[in-house]
Amino acid sequence: MSASKYKNLLKPLDLGFTTLKNRLIMGSMHTGIEEFGVLKGGHNQRGGLAPLARYFEERAKGGVGLIVTGGIAPNREGKVSPWAGKMSNKLESRAHRDITEAVHRHDSKIVMQILHAGRYGYHFWNVAPSPIKAPI
């Protein structure tokens, strides 16, 4: 990669409401770590959100300016599976603070991808325009 060809890649980007330290963006990907099931205190048998916080912190340490999380459902009906992550109350919101703080320690930003699974949801309470499950 020629430095002159991508001369702005490592320069800050002012978005008006915040500034990214560079223009490197980690796109959303589903890792399976999102499936945490926040319980009392934001922890469960799999360690709550600590593994996800460590995962994103390593990417922030690597220098990425903006991280987009994997899909998090806005409610129970929008989950991909019964154990998938969601954020629809204060407990779940507080549980995500560790992730945000871990990323911010390295001057990176993070944005949550909100994902309503619709007919791709595989559980008995999902809501979609069609009762037919997606074939994938």
Question: Positions of the model-derived regions?
Answer:
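N-terminal amphipathic alpha-helix/helix-capping segment at the start of soluble metabolic enzymes
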Residues: 2-28, 103
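N-terminal binding-site loop/beta-alpha segment at the start of enzyme catalytic domains
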Residues: 15-16, 23-46
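Loop/turn elements at helix/coil->beta-strand transitions in domains of secreted/extracellular proteins
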Residues: 21-22, 64-65, 107-109
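Conserved, mostly hydrophobic/aromatic
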Residues: 26, 59, 63, 103, ...
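Glycine-rich anion/phosphate-binding loops
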Residues: 35-58, 85-105, 124
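Catalytic domains of carbohydrate-active enzymes, especially glycoside hydrolases
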Residues: 50-75
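Glycine-rich, proline-tolerant flexible connector loops at the mouths of alpha/beta enzymes
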Residues: 66-92, 114-127
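Non-globular sequence segments
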Residues: 101-104, 109, 115-136
